From Swiss-Prot:
Its EC number(s): 2.7.7.6
Organism: Rickettsia bellii (strain RML369-C)
Main function: DNA-dependent RNA polymerase catalyzes the transcription of DNA into RNA using the four ribonucleoside triphosphates as substrates.
Protein's recorded name: DNA-directed RNA polymerase subunit alpha
Alpha N-terminal domain (alpha-NTD): annotated span: 1-237
A cellular component term, taken from the record's GO annotations: cytoplasm
InterPro entries named among the record's database cross-references: DNA-dir_RNA_pol_insert, DNA-dir_RNA_pol_RpoA/D/Rpb3, DNA-dir_RpoA, RBP11-like, RNAP_asu_C, RNApol_insert_sf
Catalytic activity: RNA(n) + a ribonucleoside 5'-triphosphate = RNA(n+1) + diphosphate
GO molecular function: DNA binding; DNA-directed RNA polymerase activity; protein dimerization activity
Pfam families to which the protein is assigned, alphabetical: RNA_pol_A_bac, RNA_pol_A_CTD, RNA_pol_L
Length: 341
């Protein structure tokens, strides 16, 4: 009977996820995942994007109260914007809450000039993430007051859902709320190669948050949500042999499964190997010395450096390695990691 675990163990396992931050902000990151099986870049990228934009917990203003105002179709003398415009601007306030319970924060200001989110008296439990965001503009000597109710939630909710059973007091206006801390997610899929195989997927994602959480945390939370939801579909029990880590004897030295980027090589030598798509020591020892010297920018000094390192593992150039590369090389590399470290 075919082992069930071969359905997932035979797939390529990505080695790592890399995060690249942008120097101008900590709220935006480039995430690179490679290598992936062909088609998995699109599958994972689309699923992660949907979860990131819809399912993470965040905080937002859900209602406002302005003295003397009973509904959103009003205007205030001395205020440039009408209530509808003020509500639209309030929806753009980005906040972070340090408690799970709702909080009421207050804004008191006197004109003239622009009134910004940074003027709100937020207290210790609420943090304003975009203090320069303009709420309204006041005429000279005009006083303006407003109470804002903040809550924790997920996704996007309409004002009708934020009016708790139509129990809001008169004068308190429910507004639409965007709780999600993720502002934007884009992704693209490119080809990447391992050895001579060039059609593996590389997933590149760009994630930007409002500062409530870091992009790395947002990606981790989205993955955890997907993991929890997909667990429901696993309707079988793994066979006993699937649960055990197999350690059958290899037809070659486990040192061949060590990645060359883990060797203490000079930058020049490491770059030459990388540019020639030599990933594992097994890829390296199958080359002859003559093959290596034909590699661009690879000279005798680099050759001698690598020969000394290979000798420490009782290896050399020009070796005949049976069954190399194995189909499940990434799985084997992780399984035998303790053998060569």
């Amino acid at each position: 009977m075919l082992s069930l675990s071969k359905n997932w163990n035979a797939l390529i396992k990505t080695d790592k996820v890399s995060y690249e931050s942008f120097p101008e902000t900590n709220n935006k990151s480039k995430i690179i995942v490679e290598p992936l099986e062909r088609g998995f870049g699109l599958t994972l990228g689309n699923a992660m994007r949907r979860v990131l934009l819809s399912s993470l917990q965040g905080a937002a203003v859900t209602s406002i109260k302005i003295p003397g105002i009973e509904h959103e179709f009003s205007s205030i003398p001395g205020v440039k914007e009408d209530i509808s415009e003020i509500i639209l601007n309030v929806k753009g306030i980005e906040i972070k809450m340090h408690v799970a319970e709702k909080r009421v924060i207050r804004l008191k200001a006197t004109g003239p000039g622009a009134i910004t989110a940074g003027m709100i008296e937020a207290g210790h439990d609420v943090e304003i993430l975009n203090p320069d965001h303009v709420i309204c503009n006041l005429a000279k000597n005009k006083q303006f007051e407003m109470e804002l109710t903040c809550k924790v939630g997920k996704g996007y909710t309409l004002s009708t859902n934020n009016n708790e059973d139509n129990n809001l007091p008169i004068g308190e206006i429910a507004i639409d709320a965007l709780f999600n801390p993720v502002k934007s997610v884009t992704y693209k899929v490119e080809n990447t190669r391992i050895g001579q195989v060039t059609d593996y997927d590389k997933l590149i994602m760009f994630v930007e948050t409002n500062g409530d959480i870091l992009p790395e945390m947002a990606v981790g939370l989205a993955a955890r949500i997907l993991q929890e939801q997909l667990q429901l579909f696993i309707s079988f029990e793994e066979q006993e042999e699937d649960k055990q880590v197999k350690t059958d004897a290899l037809p070659f030295s486990p040192y061949l499964l060590k990645r060359v980027d883990e060797l203490e090589l000079s930058v020049r030598s490491a770059n030459c190997l990388k540019n020639d798509n030599i990933i594992y020591i097994g890829d390296l020892v199958k080359r002859t010395e003559a093959d290596m010297l034909r590699t661009p920018n690879f000279g005798r000094k680099s050759l001698n450096e690598i020969k000394e390192i290979l000798a420490k593992f009782s290896l050399r150039f020009g070796m005949d390695v049976p069954d190399w590369p194995p189909e499940n090389i990434h799985e084997l590399s992780k399984r035998y990691e303790d053998s060569y470290n």
